[in-house]
Curated annotation (Swiss-Prot):
The keyword Glycosyltransferase does not apply. Keywords: Ribonucleoprotein, Ribosomal protein. Part of the 30S ribosomal subunit. This is Small ribosomal subunit protein uS10. One of its GO terms (biological process) is translation. Belongs to the universal ribosomal protein uS10 family. InterPro entries: Ribosomal_uS10 (IPR001848), Ribosomal_uS10_CS (IPR018268), Ribosomal_uS10_dom (IPR027486), Ribosomal_uS10_dom_sf (IPR036838), Ribosomal_uS10_euk/arc (IPR005729). The keyword Methyltransferase does not apply.
């Protein structure tokens, strides 16, 4: 049977957990095998900026940071299950990549 590998990325881990819970419920309702969610390494994006706009005075810096969290979910690619996965309500800052394998 075909397998679907679903990769979730987002900046809010609670919203990622919400989408993972929805995928778990779909797997339980349709009776397909599911593996995951597997947490992948978190990517940190750090941008240092100077506080003073004119360049005079002491050099004080601010560091802005954004963390990108990732989860990997494997699910059997049953037709009913995949139709329900496509209908999942996804928050704005969560992106989904679905890869089908045989």
């Amino acid at each position: 049977m075909h397998k679907a590998r679903i990769k979730l990325t987002g900046t809010d881990p609670e919203k990622l957990a919400y989408v993972c819970d929805q995928l778990k419920k779909i797997a339980e309702r349709t009776g397909v095998d599911m593996s995951g969610p597997i947490p992948l390494p978190t990517k940190r994006l750090v941008v240092p900026t100077r506080k003073s706009p004119d360049g005079e005075g002491t050099a004080t810096w601010e560091k802005w940071e954004m963390r990108i969290h990732k989860r990997l979910v494997g699910i059997e690619a049953d037709e009913r299950a995949m139709r329900q996965v496509m209908k999942v309500n996804v928050p704005d800052n969560v992106s989904i990549e679905i890869e089908l394998k045989s």
